[in-house]
């Protein structure tokens, strides 16, 4: 099984499959095809349970992808409040700026997310 299957499981929230990959030796901090890490795909797709599992296995909460985007920024861009809340509770750095020069608070129009970031 390659990156395609691992990324599919992450994006679709198939926690059992993600666990199988990770417990089978997949590195939760490895840069996957596409220049992103598992945390980015989970944050992009609103998969908070997958995020929590990856963090429990040592995933870097502030890892930047090939564009300089962190998982928190990914979750903010996509409007995934539960993911933002989880990442903040686990210590995500909300001051990091993305390639557009905006931090997490500045990068979202979602008021519920803005409230979490204040």
Swiss-Prot record:
It is found in: Cytoplasm; Nucleus; Cytoplasm, Perinuclear region. Regulates NF-kappa-B transcription factor activity. Promotes growth of cardiomyocytes, but not cardiomyocyte proliferation. Promotes cardiac muscle hypertrophy. Plays a role in the regulation of the growth of actin filaments. Inhibits the activity of the F-actin-capping protein complex. Belongs to the myotrophin family. This is Myotrophin. One of its GO terms (cellular component) is nucleus. It comes from the Eukaryota. Its main location: cytoplasm. InterPro entries: Ankyrin_rpt (IPR002110), Ankyrin_rpt-contain_sf (IPR036770). The keyword Cytoplasm applies. SUPFAM superfamilies: Ankyrin repeat (SSF48403). It holds the Pfam family Ank_2. ANK repeats lie at residues 1-30, 34-65, 67-98. The keyword Cytoplasm applies. Keywords: ANK repeat, Cytoplasm, Nucleus, Repeat.
């Amino acid at each position: 099984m390659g990156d395609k299957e691992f990324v599919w499981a992450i994006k679709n929230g198939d926690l059992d499959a993600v666990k199988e990959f990770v417990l089978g030796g997949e590195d939760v901090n490895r840069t996957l095809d596409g220049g992103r890490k598992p945390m980015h795909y989970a944050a992009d797709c609103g998969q908070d349970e997958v995020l929590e599992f990856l963090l429990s296995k040592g995933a870097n909460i502030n890892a930047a992808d090939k564009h300089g985007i962190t998982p928190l920024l990914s979750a903010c861009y996509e409007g995934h409040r539960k993911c933002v809340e989880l990442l903040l509770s686990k210590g995500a750095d909300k001051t990091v700026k993305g390639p557009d020069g905006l931090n997490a608070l500045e990068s979202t129009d979602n008021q519920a997310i803005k409230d979490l970031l204040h």
